[in-house]
Amino acid sequence: MATPSPLPSFAAIVVAAGKGLRAGQPVPKQFATWRGKPVLRHSVESLRAAGADPIVVAIPDHAGDVAAKALDGITEVVFVTGGQTRQDSVRAALERLSSVPPERVLIHDAARAILPTPVIERVLHGLDESGGAIPVLPVVDSLAVAAGERMADKADRESLRRVQTPQGFRFSDILAAHRAWTGATDAGDDAQVLMAHGGDIALVEGDEALKKLTFAEDFMADLLPVRVGTGFDVHKLEAGEELWLGGIRLEHDKGLAGHSDADVALHAIVDALLGAIGKGDIGDHFPPSDPQWKGAASSAFIEHAAKLVDEAGYRVGNIDLTIICEAPRIGPHRDAMGQRIAELLATSPDAISVKATTTEKLGFTGRGEGIAAQAAATVVRKDTPA
């Protein structure tokens, strides 16, 4: 069995300066979390493990802090501010490397998060006899040449390939090509720039895993279809307090005491929703030490939790709430509570179950000293049919 030849030394450029708006993430997609860590970190770790040194990352203006956080702990990484176009960003990174020029450089799109080591190896070895090497895959679908909304001609897919990154180059060749580029529009990729400069490009086998993360659906596909969280809360009953429970006010001789309106039912639901998406608990988001939440309506807390669920790529599946008390009687108010909770979560009342029980006169709830509530919540990936 032949022993693979060692990889030659190389530098790498990771292009991460785009806005990434189509991905529908709260931050540019290269900094969004995917499979447990920022998209950018995936490919940088792969390049670093393969021996890339240094790695120059082109980032948006004023994104230094978020980029540094995304790559915390990874050594030999240099940041440069990207330009208006991808080509401008690559040029800036190449110029940064030019002071100590490497012999070979790989240029990779950060949005291609999964970067298999065999692809890196094939691209680098493809430079043994060419000024450039790019990973490609065959075209599997039939193709048509369009003229407006009509088919004008067929296209021969046998001679076409899908192009991926990382694209590898002899550094001096690609730097000279970028400096000489006079195209009227931005180049489609760096191989196009080198070809315009008379360079030779080798084609090597790509990998389907190098899919580019582009749309919101690409991020959702990585999410679990359903996640579950639970919550529990207790508040003391005191005279002179209003009793808010399940988002509605009840008439009773005592009310629940707390920093906010002390609605244990909504608090339990908030904790269940936050737990389902791994966002801590109600105290993390609304600390009782913060005076702005003094006497606050718990409806604000549950709406905040629902917003975080949405931002995480999920929608509320269902809520199962149990209120534990001797008094007041919950039965007459269950439907109103369910309706109000559904309104706050922008979901159907059918998705909300409100139940009540007692502890048979045992414990603090049995003695009428307080009310407890527990909740279970499911959140469902937003692209799942309702």
Curated annotation (Swiss-Prot):
SUPFAM superfamilies: IpsF-like, Nucleotide-diphospho-sugar transferases. Residues 1-226 are annotated as: 2-C-methyl-D-erythritol 4-phosphate cytidylyltransferase. HAMAP family: IspDF, IspF. GO terms for molecular function: 2-C-methyl-D-erythritol 2,4-cyclodiphosphate synthase activity; 2-C-methyl-D-erythritol 4-phosphate cytidylyltransferase activity; metal ion binding. Residues 227-386 are annotated as: 2-C-methyl-D-erythritol 2,4-cyclodiphosphate synthase. It comes from the Bacteria. Bifunctional enzyme that catalyzes the formation of 4-diphosphocytidyl-2-C-methyl-D-erythritol from CTP and 2-C-methyl-D-erythritol 4-phosphate (MEP) (IspD), and catalyzes the conversion of 4-diphosphocytidyl-2-C-methyl-D-erythritol 2-phosphate (CDP-ME2P) to 2-C-methyl-D-erythritol 2,4-cyclodiphosphate (ME-CPP) with a corresponding release of cytidine 5-monophosphate (CMP) (IspF). The lineage of its organism: Bacteria, Pseudomonadati, Pseudomonadota, Alphaproteobacteria, Sphingomonadales. GO terms for biological process: isopentenyl diphosphate biosynthetic process, methylerythritol 4-phosphate pathway; terpenoid biosynthetic process. This is Bifunctional enzyme IspD/IspF. Signal peptide: none annotated. The record marks R157, K212 as: Positions MEP for the nucleophilic attack. Keywords: Isoprene biosynthesis, Lyase, Metal-binding, Multifunctional enzyme, Nucleotidyltransferase, Transferase. It holds the Pfam family IspD. A divalent metal cation binds at D233, H235, H267. 4-CDP-2-C-methyl-D-erythritol 2-phosphate binds at D233, V234, H235, H259, S260, D281, I282, G283, T357, T358, T359, E360, F364, R367. Its cofactor is a divalent metal cation. Its EC number is 2.7.7.60, 4.6.1.12. InterPro entries: IspD (IPR001228), IspD/F (IPR026596), IspD/TarI (IPR034683), ISPD_synthase_CS (IPR018294), MECDP_synthase (IPR003526), MECDP_synthase_CS (IPR020555), MECDP_synthase_sf (IPR036571), Nucleotide-diphossugar_trans (IPR029044). Pathway: Isoprenoid biosynthesis; isopentenyl diphosphate biosynthesis via DXP pathway; isopentenyl diphosphate from 1-deoxy-D-xylulose 5-phosphate: step 2/6; Isoprenoid biosynthesis; isopentenyl diphosphate biosynthesis via DXP pathway; isopentenyl diphosphate from 1-deoxy-D-xylulose 5-phosphate: step 4/6. It catalyses: 2-C-methyl-D-erythritol 4-phosphate + CTP + H(+) = 4-CDP-2-C-methyl-D-erythritol + diphosphate; 4-CDP-2-C-methyl-D-erythritol 2-phosphate = 2-C-methyl-D-erythritol 2,4-cyclic diphosphate + CMP. The record marks R22, K29, H259, T358 as: Transition state stabilizer. In the N-terminal section; belongs to the IspD/TarI cytidylyltransferase family. IspD subfamily. In the C-terminal section; belongs to the IspF family.
